[in-house]
Each structure stands twice: as structure tokens, then as C-alpha cells.
Amino acid sequence: MVRIPRRKLLPSCLCMTATVFLMVTVQVLVELGKFERKKFKNSDLQDGQKDVEGDPKHLNPLPKKDALALSGRNKVDAGSYPIVLWWSPLTGETGRLGQCGADACFFTINRTFQHHPMTKAFLFYGTDFNIDSLPLPRKAHHDWALFHEESPKNNYKLFHKPVITLFNHTATFSRHSDLPLTTQYLESVEVLKSLRYLVPLQSKNNLRQKLAPLVYVQSDCDPPSDRDSYVRELMAYIEVDSYGECLQNKHLPQQLKNPASMDADAFYRVLAQYKFILAFENAVCDDYITEKFWRPLKLGVVPVYYGSPTIADWLPSNRSAILVSEFSHPRELASFIRRLDYDDGLYETYVEWKLKGEISNQRLLTALREREWGVQDINQDNYIDTFECMVCRRVWANRRLQEQGLPPKQWKADVSHLHCPEPTLFAFSSPASPALRGRSLRELWLPSFQQSKKEAQALRWLVDRNQNFSSEEFWALVFKDSF
């Protein structure tokens, strides 16, 4: 059976995916078709469900590990292999016996296996995790595992202690996760060092006659990070070319306006002409680092970064990015960027690591060297395969302990596996874009985050009761004054 990894597909890819899904079942085609179109069809310029930062184009389309397709969806001999059930239909696999080193597990999205005696673990995709249907009652030997590499705005309740601690195993953007995905948008050390897109400084200086020093490309406006408010204020002090729908003042060439072109060589070369790229995440979370940060580094452009408070731990060198958090106001940031724009020697200190091909950050080098998955590498498993195998191996480890008469090991996630503070506005924030019909960011994201706390508490109470529940029960509990 063909291994179908999850990716945010563009319309042309959707057709190919749909064809493969038809080989599985019509039911899976409909279900996944809705799932993909809802969450993954949009622009590389957009965030969360719309953005390339949640776009795992780096998934390996041809998994490395062995997979044995089973002819019958339910033909698994009880007592033979542990069953690992994707409760979120992420992979589209109705049945696959996957080899994970010396261990093997049966992976499936078929929910009829929920009560099978050999079902040992349930896998959830964070964005798709909801209260409408959960595998309850949960038996003592049922592990829950969470895969969530995307923005917190996709599902805030996961980021609160009552919910994250429901899971035994995690794969998230946090370095503290069981399977850290912090470098999910960075292919390799070699890509960082590559000079393929580097435009010489003298050429950039000449291009400054028609280009601003800074470029901003976003089409998901007014996200929880309040980035558009900051950039809007920054524009009052320094020129910024903005190509996306947010604060747009410049247009891309017609052939690059299609979202499919956002990973195109021609688009990269447009960005590479600039001295600085505004690399602002859609949310502020520890270790939540997307292509917005890595892309300018690949292109030989200095990122002006706002997002993860822990970004300093992941810089290629101490002087490779300008951190917005180090400036008290956009006015000060603009003044500093103008200094670098006019002083070639000072500017070059920020690209010296690139020119010399020297990455001094040992944490980054170690993370890339030791991670068990690859990005756009046909010789390595993708991170979904690796996540599945991590759970499979842990299931087998406990099975062996029990065979020896020993108690099974208990794994449990904690709040460090997904940490994001509540959204905050910049002091100079102005009303949101017309797209939000006059609502401010505070009116949208902060109440959403605060309500998610109550949702997390309600969900935990219902899950601990260990009975199926309706959405009506859940929402009644969320809005109960005394809860």
C-alpha cells in the first residue's frame, strides 16, 4: 500500500492525492478531501491553517521504513502486533504493518479498531483534535499521543495543562517534546551555508535605488502576535516593501502571484535582492520557529525577527539576525536598520557567517545531526513516520516489561511540551484591518485564548469521567458560571 504522508497540498497536488485515496476507499477520499481543502489549500503567504509555516512540504513522499500492506482492513491477528490507531485521519492508511527497527505495529485510521484488544495507542493531530469524538472510555492500556507542529491559534486548548497532560507522547515544535520538531523547516546545515541565492552587497546597494531596505510578505493579517501593528508603526520610520495582502504597497510579478509560486526559485530571487526581511511569526511561543526565520538565512538576507522568545538558542551565529525584542520601539529598530543600510562594514558582520560558511551554534548543529527524521530527504523517514515509530517502540517496551512481570513505564506530557503565553498587543496597536470588520486583535484573540482555558478545564473533567459525552454537555460546562 502506498504510504501517504500528510502535507498541505496545492490544488494540482490535491488531484494527485485524491487519485491515490480512491485506491484506499471512497469514504477516506471524502473525509480527507475535506480535511485537506479546509486546512492546507491556501497560500504560502498565510499562517496557521493558511500559512506555509504549517506547510510540511518537507515531508518525505517515499517513506524509508518497511511497510507491509494488508489485504483486509480488519485482518490483524489478535496477539500478533500492537495496533496504533490514528484518531485523526492524517495518513489515509486503512491498514499498514509498519516496521520500526526490531519492532512492528499495525497503523490505521480505521476507527473500528477502537475496541480491538491489541489497540494500544491513539494518535491525534493537534489542529484536528476536537471534542466531538474522542476514543472514550479510555482503557488503562490506551496511550494517547499528540502530533502538533502548527500555530497555537489552530487549537488553543491544547496549550493548557488540563489538556496537554492527557497525552502520553508528543511531537511538537517544543524542544521539550518527546519528539522535538523545532527544526522542521530547516532541511540541513548545507542549505544554510549555501550561496545559491546570495546577492552581493554591492548589487543590493545598487538595487536600493528601486527597493526598500526591508521587505514584508504576509497575507494572514492581524494574527495573535499582532505583527501587522508593529510593521505598520515601523513603516512610519523606515521604508518597507510589503507584497502580501497585509499592508500591501507593492505587487509581485504576475507569474508569482499564484500561491504555488511561493516556493519557486523566482520568488526566492525577488526576496534575495533585499538587505532585510521582516520575519514575524503569527504567534509568540517558545521554540515556535517557522520558515519565516530560516528562509532569509538561506537566501543570504538578514532576518528582522519577532516570534519565539527562545530564538537566540537557534541562531546560526551570535550575529546572524536582528531581534525585535531588543528594541523598545519600532523607531529605535528603524534607526538601527538605517545604520546597517548605510554602513557596509557593519552590515557584513550579519552575513559574515554565511560568506564563510561557519555555523557556531552547537545546539543547532547537534539538533540537526541527532534528529531522527529528515526534511525533503528521500534517504530519511519524515517526522510523521518517526512519530509513529516512537509510539510503536514505547508500546513494545512496555509489552516486554509486562512479559517480565514488571510494571509498565508511564509517560506523560507536561506544559513544557507546548508553551505559549496569552496573546498581547503592542502598546501602539491600532484597530485591526478592515477584513476583521473593525474588531481589534484584543477583541478576537485574547478572549479566544481565555475561553480556551475554560474549554480545557471542561474537556479534562469530561475525559476524566471516562464516558462519552455530547458537544452540548461540553459547552454547557464551559459556560457554567460555577465551573
UniProtKB/Swiss-Prot annotation:
Ranges facing Lumenal side: 32-483
GO biological process: cerebral cortex radially oriented cell migration; fucosylation; N-glycan fucosylation; neuroblast migration; neuronal stem cell division; neuronal stem cell population maintenance; oligosaccharide biosynthetic process; positive regulation of protein secretion
Residues bearing carbohydrate: 110, 168, 318, 468
Species in which this protein is naturally found: Rattus norvegicus
Protein function: Protein O-fucosyltransferase that specifically catalyzes O-fucosylation of serine or threonine residues in EMI domains of target proteins, such as MMRN1, MMRN2 and EMID1. Attaches fucose through an O-glycosidic linkage. O-fucosylation of EMI domain-containing proteins may be required for facilitating protein folding and secretion. May also show alpha-(1,3)-fucosyltransferase activity toward the innermost N-acetyl glucosamine (GlcNAc) residue in biantennary N-glycan acceptors. However, this was tested with a library of synthetic substrates and this activity is unsure in vivo.
Localization (cell): Endoplasmic reticulum membrane
Protein name: GDP-fucose protein O-fucosyltransferase 3
Membrane-spanning intervals of the chain: 9-31
